[in-house]
């Protein structure tokens, strides 16, 4: 009988392709934990944080969370180039992040803080290019601090895809991109149902419970 097993190679090890939706799931299956902000298996892949980058032979560097596994792929998850790219991406996020870690409610449970430590970020080589904005305290259930948002999109997808509400979304483009309610209103003015699901997936102190 012909062998129909499909495999790919991760760091020199042959791995069988099963029901995994993307390379990140394949990599996690063999016990390798790549850094990531914006990936949740129950939400659509977004690929914004650029931390789960891998090298795919013949294709270059790709986001593992948004790349489907294919038979014959040869993948490398760790190299000097990948480590430097991940470090730069964290530094860029920190450059526009309100760094008040000691007093932040998410201190020591903040994904950004933990990844900065893990990736060895000791200094930030980039300048802040965005201006800090007022904190939104209008909601009875949560506080929204746009100055701690890393644009991972987790809250946007959770609100839209799981809750079916869409109270918040991306606004503007490029370096002016932000996550906010429609027309940049406060949360109390839009169809937020105060479910708290956005708080659960937020990796930083941008959304916190009251």
Where are these regions (language model features)?
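Fe-S ferredoxin-like electron-transfer domains
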Residues: 50, 54-191, 200-210
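Residue-level recognition of oxygen-bearing side chains
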Residues: 22, 154, 197
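Eukaryote-biased recognition of intrinsically disordered, low-complexity regulatory segments
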Residues: 2-12
């Amino acid at each position: 009988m012909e062998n129909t097993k499909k495999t790919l190679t991760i760091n020199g090890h042959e791995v069988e392709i099963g029901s995994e939706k993307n390379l990140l799931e394949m990599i996690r299956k063999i016990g390798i934990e790549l850094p990531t902000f914006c990936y949740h298996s129950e939400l659509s892949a977004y690929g914004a944080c650029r931390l789960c980058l891998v090298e795919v032979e013949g294709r270059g560097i790709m986001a593992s969370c948004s790349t489907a596994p294919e038979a014959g792929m040869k993948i490398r998850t760790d190299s000097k180039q990948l480590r430097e790219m991940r470090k730069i991406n964290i530094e860029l996020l920190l450059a526009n992040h309100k760094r008040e870690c000691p007093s932040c409610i998410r201190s020591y449970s903040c994904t950004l803080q933990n990844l900065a430590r893990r990736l060895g970020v000791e200094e930030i080589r980039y300048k802040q290019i965005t201006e800090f904005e007022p904190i939104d305290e209008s909601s009875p259930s949560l506080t929204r601090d746009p100055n701690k948002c890393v644009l991972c999109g987790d809250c946007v997808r959770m609100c839209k895809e799981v809750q079916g509400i869409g109270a918040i979304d991306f606004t503007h483009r490029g370096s002016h991109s932000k996550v906010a309610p429609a027309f940049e209103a406060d949360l109390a003015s839009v169809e937020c149902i105060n479910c708290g699901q956005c708080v659960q997936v937020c990796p930083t102190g941008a959304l916190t419970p009251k």
